[in-house]
C-alpha cells in the first residue's frame, strides 16, 4: 500500500521503517527541507542512533505526497497536528485512512489529537488512533512492542492492524 508518514521525528521514522519492512511503499515527510535531505543522505535519524534507513524509503517536504495514499500517518508534534491536518485536508483522497500517533492533547482546546484531525478533515477520511506503551527507539531496534488501534469502525481498525502488525509489533483493536 502507498503510505505517507507526516513527521520525521523519532516516532514517525520508527513507524515508517516498520511499515516499509512490512512491504509497503512508504514516504517520510519532513517539515524542514534540511532534515529531509539529512535523512536521505545519511540514512539515519539522529533520534534513532544506529538504526539504518533503507534505500527504499522515500523522503519529501511536499504535503502532496498524501495524494493517492491508502494510509496517512500523522506523527507530527502535538502543536502541529491541527495545521498539518488543515493543509492536507484537500489533498487526501476520500476514504484514505488517517492514523493519529502523536501523543498529547491540543493546548487551547483540550481536544484529543484524533478529535483535532477529525475537526479539520471532517468525515472525508476515517481516523484511527494507534497508541500504547511504546518508544520510538525500541520499535526502531525491533524490540517487541504492543499497541492498540482504535476506531469507530472495527473493520478500519483491523485494516490498520494488518498494515502495522508483525512478529515484533503486536496491534490489538478497539472501537
Regions found by a protein language model. Name each.
Residues 53, 59-67, 71-144, 160:
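Rossmann-like NAD(P)(H) cofactor-binding subdomain of soluble oxidoreductases
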Residues 21-24, 41-44, 90-93, 122, ...:
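Generic secondary-structure signature for well-ordered alpha-helical cores
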Residues 1-52, 58-61, 87:
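NAD(P)+-binding Rossmann beta1-loop-alpha1 motif at the extreme N-terminus of oxidoreductases
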Residues 43-48, 115-117, 144-148:
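Short, hinge-like loop/turn segments at secondary-structure boundaries
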Residues 136-175:
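Carboxylate- and glycine-rich phosphate/diphosphate-binding segment that chelates Mg2+/Mn2+
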